Amino acid sequence: MRKKILILGSTGSIGTQALEVIASRQDQFEVVGIAAGGRDPQLIIQQAQMLGLAADHVAVANEKSATQVSRALGAAVLSGRDAATDLVESVPADTVLNGLVGSMGLRATLATIQLGEVLALANKESLVAGGTFVTSQAAPGQIVPVDSEHSAMAQCLRSGASAEVSKLVLTASGGPFRGWSREEMWDVTPEQAAAHPTWSMGQMNTLNSATLINKGLELIEATLLFDIPADRIEVTVHPQSIVHSMVTFCDGATIAQASPPSMLLSISHALAWPHRVPEAQPALDFSQASTWDFMPVDNEAFPAVELAREVALKQGTYPAVYNAANEQAAAAFLRGRIKFPQIVDIVGEVVAGSSQFAGVASSVEEIIAHESESRRRADALVDKLSR
């Protein structure tokens, strides 16, 4: 029997690649619904028609785009800010791939967990924002990571018992400004920040990779997914992006997962978990000479990782504060209001002034309230810096 799949964020980088994977494995998977923000209504229409989806199996957040898609499909699609969550709640599925961008994916993540469906999670921000409020509601193995780094860790962790794990090692490409000083990055433009040396991603994910905020979010996500404290997670720069992550065990052995830099493998693995998909992507060719480099993160130039470690150790809703403040500061940089290094400066300042967020959230509303306050503070700092 084919697995029924919902894809949230179908027009984004993860969503389009997931559709590519599923198109080549129609004997294993069936797409039963899609959700998107609405920036590209024509692509949503094309996807819905190609998949043969009824209008009520399509969700579009942007109301204007939803009207356009509804007209093309001949009936009303689900629309509005909570359209993706409405889709999850109304269309039964075996697996929900959450590839939405930012913390807007939180409600859909929670809805998936509460329905008992498998959550293939690419929307790390929803886990970071929700923290233990999310993980405490999930059954063991219900959340399956899509990020290549966490997928790699999950694969490596199958090599030993949890009590045998000494540390996790996250790899980072280093982004387009690897080796630059803070001073050299002062006049970086949004166009420069959008040029990732290895991966093809959406605008926000690419910018987060340039600041290493993305790696900070991944560190926090790893603590939640694998129940390993942040002081036992190492981050190393690996420019080739071939070793996606490693796990060191108590006997001194380190197990690494290596494959060419592509999301096809980790997406396939998440959809088929706990099984592997044959020939999901080409394997490494060891007959070709190559060099793999590993080096420490320059924490002076890129303080985002150590700030994330601090946030993860504090717990509470600090991770939600970290993420929300970054979303505001990053948007301000893209609009030309602040300088590139000031993105993480603002995040650090908001986190430092948020002692009231130390408690564990007891509701989605509480998380959203803390996020809103963090955004307000970040916006105030942007206003101050851009005068």
Curated annotation (Swiss-Prot):
<comment type="pathway">
    <text>Isoprenoid biosynthesis; isopentenyl diphosphate biosynthesis via DXP pathway; isopentenyl diphosphate from 1-deoxy-D-xylulose 5-phosphate: step 1/6.</text>
</comment>
<feature type="binding site">
    <location>
        <position position="14"/>
    </location>
    <ligand>
        <name>NADPH</name>
    </ligand>
</feature>
<dbReference type="Pfam" id="PF02670">
    <property type="entry name" value="DXP_reductoisom"/>
</dbReference>
<feature type="binding site">
    <location>
        <position position="13"/>
    </location>
    <ligand>
        <name>NADPH</name>
    </ligand>
</feature>
<comment type="function">
    <text>Catalyzes the NADPH-dependent rearrangement and reduction of 1-deoxy-D-xylulose-5-phosphate (DXP) to 2-C-methyl-D-erythritol 4-phosphate (MEP).</text>
</comment>
<dbReference type="InterPro" id="IPR026877">
    <property type="entry name" value="DXPR_C"/>
</dbReference>
<keyword id="KW-0560">Oxidoreductase</keyword>
<feature type="binding site">
    <location>
        <position position="209"/>
    </location>
    <ligand>
        <name>1-deoxy-D-xylulose 5-phosphate</name>
    </ligand>
</feature>
<feature type="binding site">
    <location>
        <position position="37"/>
    </location>
    <ligand>
        <name>NADPH</name>
    </ligand>
</feature>
<keyword id="KW-0479">Metal-binding</keyword>
<dbReference type="GO" id="GO:0070402">
    <property type="term" value="F:NADPH binding"/>
</dbReference>
<feature type="binding site">
    <location>
        <position position="202"/>
    </location>
    <ligand>
        <name>NADPH</name>
    </ligand>
</feature>
<dbReference type="GO" id="GO:0051484">
    <property type="term" value="P:isopentenyl diphosphate biosynthetic process, methylerythritol 4-phosphate pathway involved in terpenoid biosynthetic process"/>
</dbReference>
<protein>
    <recommendedName>
        <fullName>1-deoxy-D-xylulose 5-phosphate reductoisomerase</fullName>
        <ecNumber>1.1.1.267</ecNumber>
    </recommendedName>
</protein>
<feature type="binding site">
    <location>
        <position position="173"/>
    </location>
    <ligand>
        <name>1-deoxy-D-xylulose 5-phosphate</name>
    </ligand>
</feature>
<feature type="binding site">
    <location>
        <position position="196"/>
    </location>
    <ligand>
        <name>1-deoxy-D-xylulose 5-phosphate</name>
    </ligand>
</feature>
<feature type="binding site">
    <location>
        <position position="11"/>
    </location>
    <ligand>
        <name>NADPH</name>
    </ligand>
</feature>
<feature type="binding site">
    <location>
        <position position="148"/>
    </location>
    <ligand>
        <name>1-deoxy-D-xylulose 5-phosphate</name>
    </ligand>
</feature>
<feature type="binding site">
    <location>
        <position position="214"/>
    </location>
    <ligand>
        <name>1-deoxy-D-xylulose 5-phosphate</name>
    </ligand>
</feature>
<dbReference type="GO" id="GO:0030145">
    <property type="term" value="F:manganese ion binding"/>
</dbReference>
<keyword id="KW-0521">NADP</keyword>
<feature type="binding site">
    <location>
        <position position="125"/>
    </location>
    <ligand>
        <name>NADPH</name>
    </ligand>
</feature>
<dbReference type="Pfam" id="PF08436">
    <property type="entry name" value="DXP_redisom_C"/>
</dbReference>
<keyword id="KW-0414">Isoprene biosynthesis</keyword>
<feature type="binding site">
    <location>
        <position position="123"/>
    </location>
    <ligand>
        <name>NADPH</name>
    </ligand>
</feature>
<dbReference type="InterPro" id="IPR036169">
    <property type="entry name" value="DXPR_C_sf"/>
</dbReference>
<feature type="binding site">
    <location>
        <position position="218"/>
    </location>
    <ligand>
        <name>Mn(2+)</name>
    </ligand>
</feature>
<feature type="binding site">
    <location>
        <position position="149"/>
    </location>
    <ligand>
        <name>Mn(2+)</name>
    </ligand>
</feature>
<feature type="binding site">
    <location>
        <position position="12"/>
    </location>
    <ligand>
        <name>NADPH</name>
    </ligand>
</feature>
<dbReference type="Pfam" id="PF13288">
    <property type="entry name" value="DXPR_C"/>
</dbReference>
<comment type="similarity">
    <text>Belongs to the DXR family.</text>
</comment>
<dbReference type="InterPro" id="IPR003821">
    <property type="entry name" value="DXP_reductoisomerase"/>
</dbReference>
<feature type="binding site">
    <location>
        <position position="124"/>
    </location>
    <ligand>
        <name>1-deoxy-D-xylulose 5-phosphate</name>
    </ligand>
</feature>
<dbReference type="InterPro" id="IPR036291">
    <property type="entry name" value="NAD(P)-bd_dom_sf"/>
</dbReference>
<keyword id="KW-0464">Manganese</keyword>
<dbReference type="GO" id="GO:0030604">
    <property type="term" value="F:1-deoxy-D-xylulose-5-phosphate reductoisomerase activity"/>
</dbReference>
<dbReference type="InterPro" id="IPR013512">
    <property type="entry name" value="DXP_reductoisomerase_N"/>
</dbReference>
<feature type="binding site">
    <location>
        <position position="39"/>
    </location>
    <ligand>
        <name>NADPH</name>
    </ligand>
</feature>
<feature type="binding site">
    <location>
        <position position="218"/>
    </location>
    <ligand>
        <name>1-deoxy-D-xylulose 5-phosphate</name>
    </ligand>
</feature>
<feature type="binding site">
    <location>
        <position position="215"/>
    </location>
    <ligand>
        <name>1-deoxy-D-xylulose 5-phosphate</name>
    </ligand>
</feature>
<feature type="binding site">
    <location>
        <position position="149"/>
    </location>
    <ligand>
        <name>1-deoxy-D-xylulose 5-phosphate</name>
    </ligand>
</feature>
<dbReference type="InterPro" id="IPR013644">
    <property type="entry name" value="DXP_reductoisomerase_C"/>
</dbReference>
